[in-house]
Amino acid sequence: VIHVYLDDFRACPPGFVLARNLEECLLLLQEYEVDVLSLDYDLGWGFPNGLEVVRAMISLRAYPKRIFLHTSSDAGRKHMYEMLYQQKPDHVALVNGPVPPELLMELAHPAKE
């Protein structure tokens, strides 16, 4: 199980695998079991944005267990949230905001089994 952080600019939090663009994000969603996916909207000038990632996830039916939206774009967050809310399977948790600090700590320091 992995956790994916989609962002072209911000540093990747500990415990996450960084995806810088649509292609990397979709590859990880298709090849691995993803628990937490944290999405940015703006992914660089001239590159597919977070909404295009969401559209591709829906088309491919490639979902993580939990989705968070850490983007600073209010309009982008709104569009991604609305599309995901309407299309995601019931078992996928969707949060209209960033990963909470407590969960970031938990994912950065997983309990040893």
Task: Give, region by region, the residue ranges found by the protein language model.
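Catalytic phosphate/metal-binding cores of nucleic-acid and nucleotide-processing enzymes, i.e., regions
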Residues: 1-113
